Amino acid sequence: MEADWDELSRIPVPPPSPHGLPTVATTIAFDDVSELLWAGNEFGRITSFYGPELQRYTSVRAHPVSDGPVRQILFHERGVISLSPKSVHMITRRGLTQWHISHEEMTDLYCMSFTAQLNKIIVAGCQRAMFTIDIDKGIIVDKLHTDHNYTMMKKSRYLCAATDTGSVNALSLTDFRVVKSWKSHGTAINDMDARNDLLVTCGFSVRHLGSPIVDPLANVYDLKTLSPLPPIPFHAGAAYVRMHPKLSTTSFVASQTGQLQVVDLMNPNAINLRQANVSFMLGIDISPSGEALAINDAECSIHLWGSPSKIHFNEMSKEVEFADVVPRPPPLDWSPDTPLNMIGMPYYRERLLSAWPSHLVFEVGSPPAPIDQSLIPYLRPAEMGHYAPNPKKTRRYQVENTRALTTAEPALIAPKFLSEKAREQSKFKSEASVSDTAEALAGAKLNGEAEDDPLLKYSNVEIKYSRFGVDDFDFSFSGLETHIANSFTNALLQLLKFIPLVRNLALHHAASTCIYETCLLCEMGYLFDMLEKANGQNCQATNLLKTFSSYREASNLGLLEENLTTKSLSSAIQSVNRFFLNQIAHDFRMIVPSSDDLDHRLSTIASESIRCMFCQNEIVRPGNSLANELIYPTIDIKQARRNPAFRFSSILRASIERETQNRGWCNYCRRYQQVTIRKSIHRMPLVLILNAALSNAICRRLWSIPGWLPEEVGIAVDNGQVMCFEGDELKTQLQNKLPNLVVYELVGLVSEIDIPEHQKPHLVSFINVSISSREPEAKNRWHLFNDFLVTEVDKDEALRFNQPWKSPCILAYQVKDARHAVDDSWKNVLDTTLLFRDWSLNGGRAVETRQTLTEEEKPTPGTPVALDTEFVDLEKAEIDVKADGSQEIVRPSKSGLARVSVLRGSGVHEGVPFIDDYITIKEPIVDYVTQYSGIKPGDLDPRTSQHNLVPLKVAYKKLWLLLNLGCVFVGHGLASDFRKINIQVPKSQTVDTQYLYFHPGKNRRLSLRYLAWAVFKEYIQEEPADNNQGHDSIEDARMALRLWKKFQEYEDAGIVNQILEEIFREGSKLGFRPPPRNGVATVLSRPGTAVTMQNSSGRNTPSTPDVGGAATATATTSAPATPRQAFRRSIALTPSNGTFSGPGAGDFFGGSPLK
């Protein structure tokens, strides 16, 4: 007990009914899984309290009133177990009942404890029967007879059980026989605790007058030698005792009058005394962390003691689930003036009149070939148009068949854009349930006819972009987009993400100290985290694929998309699989070179014997492998079904214990000879990744056999030999308990789809998503991942390969024991040092625009930060202009992150930047868009830049750390910024002022420039006299932060609707742009009034009017602002990513209605 320990909280025990009086707690206990304190009362009700403030969390009637009081509470990972005299009950921590057990021989239960098996407990009491209960099944599995009445149980080296006569029995944990018994106290034992090898008891004895009184000694026993140790003197009367969970020889001893003593059992003279403010103590308990102590008294109160600076109940607690806030339905403004298009129209499902049949559509000529985007950076102006070096991708006099390009893709019925839905319903209406992509595609055929076609979901899918960007789509599952170079790896990335052990490895590595710019394992961690946070929105693997493209080895091996013209997709993805696994291993060892965690998970540990067939000389070298290729025997298809050598398990065994013959150099013969190479396996990995390696049509016949690919295989390694089993043979070996047998289950596979009907080959993945689910699922659920189209499929369909257009490429098996092994502990070990130190590529030049965070400012969940980013153009958008003049975005513009500014959103330094990084870009920059981004040539070059220049990996990791620390990002138009950064932020961590200041009756988003003027009468983002200046991201982020604070003031005052009405009324007059500085302008004051601004002062911010007088202000004299399109806000009408509201107050400015 440290010097600053004191009473932190005191709460009354909740009454048994809403109008009842508080009652005494019959038992209290700290939860060893979550930050909860549990208490039970005499009416059979158990209640939990959250955190140091002891907030009410759950309250459940666990036992009928007739069963008596709650006498003990135990904790399991799956729930909470309570005991009353006549029943045992288990609930989840949210209060849902798991099971309830009562028995005719359960008459006076007092205690319970875990046994040697962690899924079983034993319950006992003042009765002649003890019961063993299986927690998982909720049933009694055994009944034991006993000659003792037990009142208390504690588990340590033995099961220590106190009797009602003052004795303590040490019971065996396996058969519960009495190993040793001590007469500890004369009358009864009041409390005891056992931990490690020590047992301490407190109790009563009879003195002179014949009535029992509390013993002034706490008895101590050594469970290792089963002998008593010197007792602990405690003159106030030792009534209660608890052993410290961390300090093995330290115990807390308490009296009934509230005196607390912390004593070392090995040194009784070293004591620490405290006095609790209680009239009569009924019990104590100490938290698993040792940092909190709970006291239960006779005045119906619970006291919490601890250190105010560092109290917590557990070292590693699971997050406590709280109830969702139920949104209130928005009021419907129904009046004669309400336009009917506010009500919305239903979605169509039948065929539209505009869908003309194919026999009425005729070709009228081929469109010109589109310009290769790779030529754009090299274009040079000429007298007419531009010119560039010829890339020589076609032969001489060869032209491109552009008609084939337009008709190669099937006519797929795409789902509705969200922007189309926005015309039918307002933002504040709850989004109606719409069919997912698979349902939207169902019923269409490749030729456009409305008939069912099972091949449609396997077809090539291409995103049709709207002018609002890709966030304008509405899909029910998170897929990966296809418009990025090397996106043919999407199927493999999805497969790796759904392997729990690979997913855990990547996320833990991403949370480490790694800041290597080309770390593929980090990028996988970022992508997997993004896919989990997306909740059905599309994601893109831009950063990962950019890193993959930067590897010279990948280019030399022909693994990039530009090199696949002469290589099949199947062989290419298998080569990429080997490259990914090797690079993952390399990246992992760069941070933890001495750890074998990756080898344990992914690597087949083996030795390779090479023997010369001429001289029989043999050498042995390591032969570890990360990916195994299947080797097929010479196949007689007639015997394939009956011959065991053609079973998958046999082929797998031969592939792992690969034995080959070829020519090699013999050091003994000093010449090339015929050598035999054979592998001896020492250990199999937890994750087994296989390349199918289908080299000919004969091997493919095996796969076409129904049920040939098993869902489960068993592998046993014995003295370097591998044994593989499947089907009934595997079940037999499991029943016989074959040593070292490990069962693997199929997580998923990557397949090549080659439908010959005017389609190009592409890759899909079939994944059993139940394996990676956090909650146990009895049924396997298989899904087809076809880039951004995700569809649930039947298991037989996923594992059937008797179609000529479907070929297996990569298989992934994982040990069955790792099912649902989704580990989120990486969030608790995030390495945040990058946020607290400077990092620069250009020699650490002084940065005056920011002030680095201190340790005292470490972000916590809910910490607001203001964000703004700037981008440069790497590629222009590809737009197809149709014959009727309409435009369709074929491929969006490609932007590169150039600057990131993050400001503190609260505290003493509110509004002060702590991140202001410029990002170096190695790709050719088409346009710096200086007028809008403020980025000038040379700003991103380490040799000439005067700013803090960092790699993209460092800037991205800072934002990723803030995201996973729980920060709330405040900004304007964040949806566009997040997409270009390639990061997924949940709605609960986003405050977008573009959606805060949105009127439900106006289909318009307001620019930050206009909002700054409308709310604060300030001019930002003005047209500079020098076009080489442009925007300032710090200014934009600070303005967004101030707008949020001001909006909170409007909410507190209840005038949000009036303010929005006034803002939109004035905006419609001014074209939603700030008025020119010269001239008279009418600005907002309060609802229903106006203020006239005169030109006089020349300041950015107009003068603040007096609070009590007429609201007047002055504006500056300047050149009028030229209307222009905000480049960085080009998707101002993108669907909302959500809003965040919370307590806070901003400054009061002139014209505020709060005045």
UniProtKB/Swiss-Prot annotation:
<dbReference type="InterPro" id="IPR036397">
    <property type="entry name" value="RNaseH_sf"/>
</dbReference>
<dbReference type="InterPro" id="IPR015943">
    <property type="entry name" value="WD40/YVTN_repeat-like_dom_sf"/>
</dbReference>
<feature type="binding site">
    <location>
        <position position="1036"/>
    </location>
    <ligand>
        <name>a divalent metal cation</name>
    </ligand>
</feature>
<dbReference type="GO" id="GO:0004535">
    <property type="term" value="F:poly(A)-specific ribonuclease activity"/>
</dbReference>
<dbReference type="InterPro" id="IPR038765">
    <property type="entry name" value="Papain-like_cys_pep_sf"/>
</dbReference>
<dbReference type="InterPro" id="IPR013520">
    <property type="entry name" value="Exonuclease_RNaseT/DNA_pol3"/>
</dbReference>
<dbReference type="GO" id="GO:0000932">
    <property type="term" value="C:P-body"/>
</dbReference>
<dbReference type="InterPro" id="IPR050785">
    <property type="entry name" value="PAN2-PAN3_catalytic_subunit"/>
</dbReference>
<dbReference type="InterPro" id="IPR036322">
    <property type="entry name" value="WD40_repeat_dom_sf"/>
</dbReference>
<feature type="region of interest" description="Disordered">
    <location>
        <begin position="1086"/>
        <end position="1155"/>
    </location>
</feature>
<dbReference type="Pfam" id="PF20770">
    <property type="entry name" value="PAN2_N"/>
</dbReference>
<feature type="region of interest" description="Linker">
    <location>
        <begin position="316"/>
        <end position="452"/>
    </location>
</feature>
<keyword id="KW-0540">Nuclease</keyword>
<dbReference type="GO" id="GO:0006397">
    <property type="term" value="P:mRNA processing"/>
</dbReference>
<keyword id="KW-0963">Cytoplasm</keyword>
<feature type="domain" description="USP">
    <location>
        <begin position="453"/>
        <end position="816"/>
    </location>
</feature>
<feature type="binding site">
    <location>
        <position position="868"/>
    </location>
    <ligand>
        <name>a divalent metal cation</name>
    </ligand>
</feature>
<feature type="repeat" description="WD 1">
    <location>
        <begin position="20"/>
        <end position="59"/>
    </location>
</feature>
<keyword id="KW-0677">Repeat</keyword>
<feature type="repeat" description="WD 2">
    <location>
        <begin position="102"/>
        <end position="145"/>
    </location>
</feature>
<dbReference type="GO" id="GO:0003676">
    <property type="term" value="F:nucleic acid binding"/>
</dbReference>
<dbReference type="InterPro" id="IPR012337">
    <property type="entry name" value="RNaseH-like_sf"/>
</dbReference>
<feature type="repeat" description="WD 3">
    <location>
        <begin position="276"/>
        <end position="315"/>
    </location>
</feature>
<dbReference type="InterPro" id="IPR030843">
    <property type="entry name" value="PAN2"/>
</dbReference>
<dbReference type="GO" id="GO:0031251">
    <property type="term" value="C:PAN complex"/>
</dbReference>
<dbReference type="Pfam" id="PF13423">
    <property type="entry name" value="UCH_1"/>
</dbReference>
<dbReference type="InterPro" id="IPR028889">
    <property type="entry name" value="USP_dom"/>
</dbReference>
<comment type="function">
    <text>Catalytic subunit of the poly(A)-nuclease (PAN) deadenylation complex, one of two cytoplasmic mRNA deadenylases involved in mRNA turnover. PAN specifically shortens poly(A) tails of RNA and the activity is stimulated by poly(A)-binding protein pab1. PAN deadenylation is followed by rapid degradation of the shortened mRNA tails by the CCR4-NOT complex. Deadenylated mRNAs are then degraded by two alternative mechanisms, namely exosome-mediated 3'-5' exonucleolytic degradation, or deadenylation-dependent mRNA decaping and subsequent 5'-3' exonucleolytic degradation by xrn1.</text>
</comment>
<feature type="compositionally biased region" description="Polar residues">
    <location>
        <begin position="1091"/>
        <end position="1104"/>
    </location>
</feature>
<dbReference type="InterPro" id="IPR048841">
    <property type="entry name" value="PAN2_N"/>
</dbReference>
<feature type="compositionally biased region" description="Low complexity">
    <location>
        <begin position="1110"/>
        <end position="1123"/>
    </location>
</feature>
<feature type="domain" description="Exonuclease">
    <location>
        <begin position="865"/>
        <end position="1043"/>
    </location>
</feature>
<feature type="binding site">
    <location>
        <position position="977"/>
    </location>
    <ligand>
        <name>a divalent metal cation</name>
    </ligand>
</feature>
<dbReference type="GO" id="GO:0000289">
    <property type="term" value="P:nuclear-transcribed mRNA poly(A) tail shortening"/>
</dbReference>
<comment type="subunit">
    <text>Forms a heterotrimer with an asymmetric homodimer of the regulatory subunit pan3 to form the poly(A)-nuclease (PAN) deadenylation complex.</text>
</comment>
<comment type="similarity">
    <text>Belongs to the peptidase C19 family. PAN2 subfamily.</text>
</comment>
<feature type="binding site">
    <location>
        <position position="870"/>
    </location>
    <ligand>
        <name>a divalent metal cation</name>
    </ligand>
</feature>
<dbReference type="Pfam" id="PF00929">
    <property type="entry name" value="RNase_T"/>
</dbReference>
<dbReference type="GO" id="GO:0046872">
    <property type="term" value="F:metal ion binding"/>
</dbReference>
<dbReference type="InterPro" id="IPR028881">
    <property type="entry name" value="PAN2_UCH_dom"/>
</dbReference>
<keyword id="KW-0479">Metal-binding</keyword>
<keyword id="KW-0507">mRNA processing</keyword>
